[in-house]
Amino acid sequence: MTSDKYLDGGLNALQRCYKSFFDKLSDKMGSAENVSGTYDDGGSHIYLVWSVAVYAEAMADSLKFTNKYEKKFENVFQCLKRYWSPEYNACCASYYFQGNNDVYFDDNAQVAIALATAGYYTSNSSRKKHYLDRAEAIIAFIINQGWNQQKGGVAWHVNSGSPPHANLNACSTAMCSLAALRLAYAVDDPKKKQQLVTFAWNCVQWIESNLVDHTGLVCDGLSLNNGKWDLDSTKFTYNTGATLATMALLLGFNDIIKGLPNIDKIHSYLENMASAALNTSGEMYDQSCKTNFKVWKDNTFFAQHLSEGLMGFSFAMPNSSLVKSAQQMVFDQADFVMNHVRDPKDGLYFRDLNIYKISPELTNTFNKIFHADQHFQPDKDERVQGSGPVEKLPLCKSLIGSSGAARMLFPAAEIIARKNNPQSGPILGGRPASGEKDKGCFIC
């Protein structure tokens, strides 16, 4: 236990996920029940790579604060290898088999973020090389095969980047730019840093030009229909949050970004987007809330990115008048998640911040907290998958729900850590590497 409830909460969520969803004998991550985000692999309910990636990101985040889970991260790394496609040099959505082309760029960006972050913070040089080599392979795949050479932006899936059914998404473009920067912090080669930072800035400019609308928030993406690119104006916390986080990280590369085109706009981009993200009358907030504090209208594994983005903004732009509000929003959302999305029976988390989608009891809680008048709206993803009325199916917890919650708590913990030990710049500095190979490291 530490003196920080957010750090303790995040670490506890990781440990409970490890005990509940990781099979140490087979290096598999799955569920005893058929829950959302799993697929049937010979009778076992195995998690799709997205869930494992979010858990890996949360594990990597923990290394900023403690080496407690360094060995466990190796186990997760072994698990991720089961999804690895040698054809793509990236992870498939499910376990790899020859001919498996179900490969998503946003999934792989989150895998790369986990590996690059772990590589940056690990205290062992052997692990660092293994993690960063794999992260570099993924980023090369993203840049070479994901970026649309004609329109710009990053495709969602390897089969959705070109006509007749092309999609260029905020989730993929923002997450890939964030992954590139996490890797740029971890590598030493100046040329590689330059290439990664340039790619990330290109992604930000594309998002600003194509997906940011009059609200100042990031829309979901572009779809090609009958030769015309149509904008999906849906606003998810994921997209605005990841874009904020990317811009915050960019400001840590002062010497590199000086020569980038239009880089003088980055501060206004950041300020305007943070302001929009903090507008509680906006689309990312649940407007059924009648109180000053409104919960985000999303799930934990989307909202995690907005927590990270607002936290990053607050340290990248320390003189902004929005810093205090941004940090308070991170705390308030984290408090809500710990108090109401966490199931005290097992310490794991549900998925929805809009808890009226979980149970009648939590609907009553929501209405009481927010002076709202919501009706119970059962979400099938909060329940064991099956037939019959959704509300009759048993409630369940998932890897991605709890991992997303952990990643909402760690930004709050980072704010506290920096207040106790002031440190400038957009990211916490890495713990010093040992420079020695770990003989007990079974990935070496």
List each model region and its residues.
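The core hydrophobic/aromatic register in alpha-helical repeat solenoids, strongest
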Residues: 59-62, 115-118, 180-183, 187, ...
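Inter-helical turn/loop segments and adjacent helix faces that build the functional surface
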Residues: 118-126, 183-195, 250-261
